[in-house]
Amino acid sequence: MKKNLSILLLAFLLACTSNELILKVVSAGQLFDDIQKNNSSDLILINVWSTWCVPCIEEFPYIVDLESKYKPKDLDVIFVSTDWDENSVEVQDFLLKENVFGRHYRKEEGNDQEFINELCSSWSGVLPFTVVYDRNMALIDFWGGKKDEHFFKSKIDSLINSKGQEI
């Protein structure tokens, strides 16, 4: 009986951990540091979005879907909200509604241009914005504006295949 209870408790704790959302407020430098500490994937896709951005919300499900289509060793999907502090509850509610769990971020208020330049110096500031890095945080690719499901799948397939040829 005691053994069964221990197994049940362990299963419950593991289930809770996998469905946990962690939303940290960060600068670009803190974002990179945190990703490097917590990531083991070959590719890191960072999507910058906001709850008030209609194109961001429209493409969001396509990006969420990527995590179920690829192995964790191949791709890590990270969302960074640009919403202000006063909208932090809306950000968290939206992520949970979209079944987004794990470690994600909200850009700290202020220093927008500094954040843009650190994330990708070629970024105009348009939302949504998606950038892909390798495991060492070397820039691989980026694009701005809303993209469709086919674009995301084709792009990630291509990047994973090209990474496989380098190894």
Predicted segment positions?
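Thiol-/selenol-based redox modules, centered on thioredoxin-like
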Residues: L127-I167
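Thiol-based oxidoreductase modules, predominantly thioredoxin-like and allied folds used
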Residues: D74-S88, V100-G110
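Short pre-active-site segment immediately N-terminal to redox-active cysteine/selenocysteine motifs
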Residues: D42-I44, V48-W52, W84, V126
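Hydrophobic h-region of N-terminal signal peptides that target proteins for export
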Residues: L10-S18
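Short, internal strand/loop/helix patches
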Residues: F94-L127
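A short beta-strand-turn-helix
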Residues: L23-I44
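Conserved redox-active cysteine motifs that mediate thiol-disulfide chemistry
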Residues: V48-Y62
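Conserved helix-turn-beta segment immediately C-terminal to the redox Cys motif
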Residues: F60-S81, L96
